[in-house]
């Protein structure tokens, strides 16, 4: 049965829009856990556009399930992760001009720097995942440099313009899962997943955790966060 990791970045985005203290992502994380989330995911960006250092520190003290920190593989972020010690870190690409993470890491190009970051984080007892496209070459290099997990970037599937394109993207994801499992890599998935499409990916099998944020927070505005998390959790677990 797959797990649901709830990304609460958008709660912080709303707070930062007015520069105040509400809504508090710490409170949102607690509600998500009460509703059945198996973990909480946050992205501490270098520009601190949404999640703040304060959020990370308090969440480390309050999260009762698992805390997954998305981060760039920089010296600053590695040092922060080692000080706070989330259960897991997901290394992601980061561009200051992007609205959200636009694609997977190019592990082949950055493998030396990523290997150093992975080794430091693992030495601190942290599970390390790499956010990558469902590309066999990227998966093989992720395994080569010692990652514990990959998180498959599902954005191309979510943005497919036709049924045929969607099917082709699903095949890529399925093949990526099979290869990662063959290499003894754990597999997570995320980006662009919603109430209308997540079951198609979950039905593939072999994916341990789905990290979902925007779709849950969008529904939460209409039905409340508790209900939104429960609905998504049911889709993920019983696909």
Swiss-Prot record:
Residues the entry annotates as binding 1-deoxy-D-xylulose 5-phosphate: 9-10, 45, 50, 100
Keyword annotations from UniProtKB, A to Z: Cytoplasm, Pyridoxine biosynthesis, Transferase
Pfam families, per database record: PdxJ (PF03740)
Reactions catalysed, as given in the entry: 3-amino-2-oxopropyl phosphate + 1-deoxy-D-xylulose 5-phosphate = pyridoxine 5'-phosphate + phosphate + 2 H2O + H(+)
Annotated compartments: Cytoplasm
Site description Transition state stabilizer, residues in chain: 151
Active site residues of this protein: 43, 70, 191
GO cellular component terms, A-Z: cytosol
Primary residence: cytoplasm
InterPro entries with a match to the protein in the record: Aldolase_TIM, PyrdxlP_synth_PdxJ, Pyridoxine-5'_phos_synth
Pathway(s) the chain acts in: Cofactor biosynthesis; pyridoxine 5'-phosphate biosynthesis; pyridoxine 5'-phosphate from D-erythrose 4-phosphate: step 5/5
Matches recorded under SUPFAM superfamilies: Pyridoxine 5'-phosphate synthase
Single GO BP term: pyridoxine biosynthetic process
EC number: 2.6.99.2
Protein family membership: Belongs to the PNP synthase family.
Assembly description: Homooctamer; tetramer of dimers.
Functional description taken from the UniProt entry: Catalyzes the complicated ring closure reaction between the two acyclic compounds 1-deoxy-D-xylulose-5-phosphate (DXP) and 3-amino-2-oxopropyl phosphate (1-amino-acetone-3-phosphate or AAP) to form pyridoxine 5'-phosphate (PNP) and inorganic phosphate.
The protein, known as: Pyridoxine 5'-phosphate synthase
Lineage: Bacteria, Pseudomonadati, Thermodesulfobacteriota, Desulfuromonadia, Geobacterales
């Amino acid at each position: 049965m797959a797990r649901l990791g709830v990304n609460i970045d958008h709660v912080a985005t709303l707070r930062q829009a007015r520069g105040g203290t509400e809504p508090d992502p710490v409170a949102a994380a607690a509600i998500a856990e009460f509703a059945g989330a198996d973990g909480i995911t946050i992205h501490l960006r270098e520009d601190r556009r949404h999640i703040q250092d304060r959020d990370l520190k308090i969440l480390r003290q309050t999260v009762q399930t698992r805390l997954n920190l998305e981060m760039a593989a920089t010296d600053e972020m590695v040092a922060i992760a080692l000080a706070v010690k989330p259960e897991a870190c997901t290394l992601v690409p980061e561009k200051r001009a992007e609205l959200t993470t636009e694609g997977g890491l190019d592990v082949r190009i950055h493998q030396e720097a990523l290997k150093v970051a992975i080794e430091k984080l693992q030495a601190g007892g942290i599970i390390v995942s790499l956010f990558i496209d469902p590309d066999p070459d990227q998966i093989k290099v992720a395994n080569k440099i010692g990652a514990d997990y990959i998180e498959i970037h599902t954005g191309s599937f979510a943005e497919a313009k036709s049924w045929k394109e969607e099917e082709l993207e699903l095949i890529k994801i399925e093949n990526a899962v099979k290869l990662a499992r063959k290499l003894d890599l754990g597999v997570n998935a995320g980006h662009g997943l919603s109430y209308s499409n997540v079951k198609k990916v979950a039905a593939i099998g072999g994916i341990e955790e789905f990290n979902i944020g925007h779709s849950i927070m969008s529904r939460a505005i209409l039905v409340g966060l508790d209900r939104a998390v429960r609905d998504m959790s049911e889709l993920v677990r019983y696909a």
